[in-house]
Amino acid sequence: MIDQKVIVALDYDNQADALAFVDRIDPASCRLKVGKEMFTLFGPDFVRELHKRGFSVFLDLKFHDIPNTCSKAVRAAAELGVWMVNVHASGGERMMTASREILEPYGKDRPLLIGVTVLTSMEQSDLAGIGLNVAPQDHVIRLATLTKNSGLDGVVCSAQESSLLKNELGKEFKLVTPGIRPLGSEQGDQRRIMTPLEAVQAGSDYLVIGRPITQAVDPAAVLQAINTSLTK
């Protein structure tokens, strides 16, 4: 099977609407991301419904806690059978290492474990507001390096950091990029954005795209256009 680069971010407060959308797209064309709102509303059974329909799921809950608690949450995600799960890199090396180690018994069936660096909505002024007098890119590099040293599979980062991180951390270190907007779509609340082709050319491995697909009149056609653009 082709390794789909597009991850569609589901953003619904109604489960029926979410599943109605999912039934309009092909599991071969993308993966799906389930975040905090949907998981809190609908729980693990919603993820199981997506699995029944043939989709791989990125469980985007950004765990951040003491090592014991965080690692057990990651193990619960593995038990659920998700393809990818993430933790906040700012939780530190011990937290990330514990989360990686708890997945070892799952072998090849384990989910990818990804670190979250700097949220794409954050600018330098936001970092300064929490006491970090550093440019977003510099902080991303610091946290991404810590993530790799902790043995994780990759990081979530903006496309602007992708090229630099690929060079710094190697081609095998996966880069998951939100803030992706196909040409002609609105910027929304993501501050650091790039088109799908630009992001892949910069080094991103997986592209998180939400409203430009979920709110499209023909989401399957939008997915096809994006995937076609990535093969040029």
From Swiss-Prot:
UniProt xrefs under InterPro entries: Aldolase_TIM (IPR013785), OMPdecase (IPR014732), OMPdecase_AS (IPR018089), OMPdecase_bac (IPR047596), OMPdeCOase_dom (IPR001754), RibuloseP-bd_barrel (IPR011060)
Catalytic activity: orotidine 5'-phosphate + H(+) = UMP + CO2
EC number(s) recorded for this UniProt protein: 4.1.1.23
Alphabetized Gene3D superfamilies for the sequence: Aldolase class I
Enzyme class: lyase
Binding site for substrate: 11, 33, 60-69, 120, 181, 190, 210-211
Domain of life: Bacteria
A GO cellular-component term linked to this record: cytosol
GO MF terms held by the record: orotidine-5'-phosphate decarboxylase activity
UniProt KW keywords: Decarboxylase, Lyase, Pyrimidine biosynthesis
GO biological process: 'de novo' pyrimidine nucleobase biosynthetic process; 'de novo' UMP biosynthetic process
Catalytic residues (UniProt): 62 (proton donor)
Pathway the protein contributes to: Pyrimidine metabolism; UMP biosynthesis via de novo pathway; UMP from orotate: step 2/2
Pfam families for this protein: OMPdecase (PF00215)
Subunit comment: Homodimer.
Task of the protein: Catalyzes the decarboxylation of orotidine 5'-monophosphate (OMP) to uridine 5'-monophosphate (UMP).
Family affiliation: Belongs to the OMP decarboxylase family. Type 1 subfamily.
This protein's name: Orotidine 5'-phosphate decarboxylase
Source organism of this protein record: Vibrio vulnificus (strain YJ016)
Gene from which the chain derives: pyrF
